[in-house]
Curated annotation (Swiss-Prot):
<dbReference type="InterPro" id="IPR013083">
    <property type="entry name" value="Znf_RING/FYVE/PHD"/>
</dbReference>
<keyword id="KW-0436">Ligase</keyword>
<feature type="zinc finger region" description="RING-type; degenerate">
    <location>
        <begin position="1"/>
        <end position="46"/>
    </location>
</feature>
<keyword id="KW-0479">Metal-binding</keyword>
<keyword id="KW-0833">Ubl conjugation pathway</keyword>
<dbReference type="Pfam" id="PF13639">
    <property type="entry name" value="zf-RING_2"/>
</dbReference>
<dbReference type="InterPro" id="IPR001841">
    <property type="entry name" value="Znf_RING"/>
</dbReference>
<keyword id="KW-0862">Zinc</keyword>
<dbReference type="GO" id="GO:0008270">
    <property type="term" value="F:zinc ion binding"/>
</dbReference>
<keyword id="KW-0863">Zinc-finger</keyword>
<dbReference type="InterPro" id="IPR017907">
    <property type="entry name" value="Znf_RING_CS"/>
</dbReference>
<protein>
    <recommendedName>
        <fullName>Zinc finger-containing protein P28b</fullName>
    </recommendedName>
</protein>
<dbReference type="GO" id="GO:0016874">
    <property type="term" value="F:ligase activity"/>
</dbReference>
Amino acid sequence: MKLFTQNDRYFGLLDSCTHIFCITCINIWHKTRRETGASDNCPICRTRFRNITMSKFYKLVN
């Protein structure tokens, strides 16, 4: 398994799918969704998630 990183950037990894987001962007998006009462779904595939994990590394999945 090969892990990737980009300088001092942190990523948001969802527990339900393999999509990778900028941690700041996904946290803002998630906060806005929660304030409007929307469910916690991935913005790309709409799979429901429970946790966003902050990570300096990510792996590519084929």
